[in-house]
Structure formats: structure tokens, C-alpha cells
Amino acid sequence: QRMYSRRLNASYKKIEEVSKIKDSFLAIYMEKCVDYLNKVDKYRSSLRHAVKHEGADAAIAMLRAPSFADGEFKDLLADFDSAFLGIFPDFVEKVNEHMQPEHCLQMPEKNALSTELRILALIRMGISKRSKIAKVLNMSVTTIYSYHSNLQKHSLHPDSSFDKVIANL
């Protein structure tokens, strides 16, 4: 009965941890959505201003400029990296425990994940379909397969258990 009680307590702790992680990500997601909606509204206002004061050609030039979407995507990735590492501060170390020593992964800078680490972070979060990972990271499915295949090949689990190991970190 003690064994059962310990297992039950461990399960409760795991559920509590998962609940806190979900709450954290939900709060971050909501904040990001509100920020994005405010930026879109500001962008719309600047387009209206451009049409009114500078003409349609100025507004068309603004619409053709990729800077708004590109900047937002970079900000989204930076926010994701920061949030993920805030919740899982030892993620990179845990990943590297499952990689061949000569193929350990590094963060390109403090609080920033590389593409490889982002792919693994998404797998850790339960997003395992390559098509969904590709969509989130704005990459082709082929590119994601290539990255993932390379990661798996250089892991200590070059079989199909690699994703399961990462998901359970």
C-alpha cells in the first residue's frame, strides 16, 4: 500500500507540474496575442494615415515591405525561446545527455534556441507531427525532416524512441 501511495503522490506531482506549465504557456500566449492585435491595429492606422496623407502608392509600398511580418516572426521566436527556457531551464543540458558527445547542441546566444533545439522543444511540448512543426517554425516539411533525421542520427537513441525520450525530458 505504501508503494501505491508513493506512486499516486508522484502522479499528482507530475499532474501539478504539467498544469503549471500549461498555465504558464497559456498566459504567455494570451499576452502575445494581445500584443500582436495591438501591433496590427497600429499598422492599420499607419496604412490609413499613409493613404490619407501620402496617397495609395505609399500604402501599397508599406504593404509590399516584408519588414512587419518578418519582425513579428522573429519576435515570436524570441518570445517562445525565452518562455520555453523559463519553464524548462535545463532543457539543453537534458537534451545533450541524449546526444553523442561530439554532437551536443549549443544555444547560439543566451536565452535563444537554435532551430534544432526549437524542433526538440516543440516535440517536448507534444507537437510531434513534422507538418505542424514546419508550420510553427515557418519552414518546409522537408527541412524539418532533414533537421530531425540529423538530430536522431547523432543521438544516443538513433531508433524510433528518440522522440519519446525528448517528449519525456
Describe the function of each predicted region.
Residues 3-115:
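Membrane-proximal linker segments that couple transmembrane helices to downstream signaling/catalytic modules
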Residues 68-169:
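Cytosolic nucleotide-binding catalytic cores of signal-transduction proteins
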